[in-house]
Amino acid sequence: HYNNRSGVRATCPDCHVPHEFVPKMIRKLKASKELYGKIFGVIDTPQKFEAHRLTMAQNEWRRMKDNNSQECRNCHNFEYMDTTAQKSVAAKMHDQAVKDGQTCIDCHKGIAHKLPDMREVEPGF
């Protein structure tokens, strides 16, 4: 989402900070734990960050699943998608996702960041 063919650039807060006031404040409080990790050496080197990448990603995926991928939906909305303009496989997947009540993060993990080492994750995560 940072570099793409359309030139529209999503920055960190677009995906990681809710727009509504109360959810935004809750997210900022939770982010203090991440700041603590950086300051006190838990994730202060690339190696330590990589060692914690899966846990951090799973926490973020859970947050996005719990809020129905709201930050994605600020820009992307099933209701306004023209699936006829999409590649056939994407259209089928989006139509099925709507029927199954899925949210963006169910299929689009790794859309903006490289995925962590997924060997410890059970298939179909």
In which residue ranges do the predicted regions lie?
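Short sequence/structural segments immediately N-terminal
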Residues: H1-F125
